[in-house]
Regions:
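Tryptophan-anchored aromatic micro-motifs
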Residues: 31-50
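N-terminal glycine/threonine-rich, aromatic-flanked beta-hairpin/loop signature
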Residues: 57-92
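Short, solvent-exposed loop/hinge segments that bridge or flank secondary-structure elements
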Residues: 45-63
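C-terminal motif of bacterial Sec signal peptides marking the signal peptidase cleavage site
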Residues: 15-18
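Beta-sheet ligand-binding and adhesion/scaffold domains
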Residues: 58, 63-70, 97-165
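Sec-dependent signal peptide recognition
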Residues: 3-10
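Bacterial Sec signal peptide processing site at the extreme N-terminus
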Residues: 20-35
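Short, surface-exposed coil-to-beta transition loops
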Residues: 49-53, 82-88, 111-117
Length: 165
């Protein structure tokens, strides 16, 4: 008697979860499709042999989502592949500074997902990536509040560019 009850409970939970997920996706698709205030911008930064490509989707209220791909240097003779960080950004503007969480993977071999805070100072059309002290507490990484973020020593200065589809 216990096994049929477990089976019925499992099927019911699966059906409920499946239905709620599909409605969430349709709501998200509808909200994204009706947003006329969404602004897409693409940027590229080059520093010596390193490059970074940033795609930002910004709403009128300053919320930002997008992608960031950073490629570092050349492939070393003993390396499996070139170091490439590829991931998503999610954050918002506070004044002229964009604060985001960058969730990424390094290369295609490493399956570990990392999340780090990033800060970009907007000067005209340029975004300058800042360097600051970070700390991890209770599984969350963040900039230290009592230490300023330095935008002068950052290696990546993003210039606006054409968006690739």
């Amino acid at each position: 008697m216990r096994y049929p009850l477990r089976l019925i409970a499992f099927i019911s939970c699966t059906a409920v979860l499946g239905c709620s997920q599909s409605s969430d996706k349709s709501e998200q698709a509808g909200a994204a499709g009706t947003r006329a205030d969404l602004k897409k911008e693409c940027f590229r930064a080059v520093f010596e042999k390193d490059t970074a490509d940033l795609v930002m989707n910004t709403t009128a209220d300053g919320k930002v989502k997008g992608t960031l791909v950073m490629s570092y240097g050349e492939v070393k003779p003993n390396a499996v592949e070139k170091t490439v960080n590829r991931g998503d950004i999610d954050g918002s503007f506070k004044g002229d500074t964009l604060f985001v969480n960058y969730t990424y993977k390094t290369g295609s071999v490493n399956k570990t997902v990392y999340t780090n805070p990033l800060a970009f100072l907007k000067k005209g059309e340029t975004l300058i990536m800042g360097v600051g002290d970070i700390e991890t507490s209770m599984g969350r990484t963040y900039f230290l509040k009592d230490k300023p973020i330095d935008f002068e020593i950052g290696r990546f200065k993003f210039q606006p560019g054409e968006c690739k589809n």
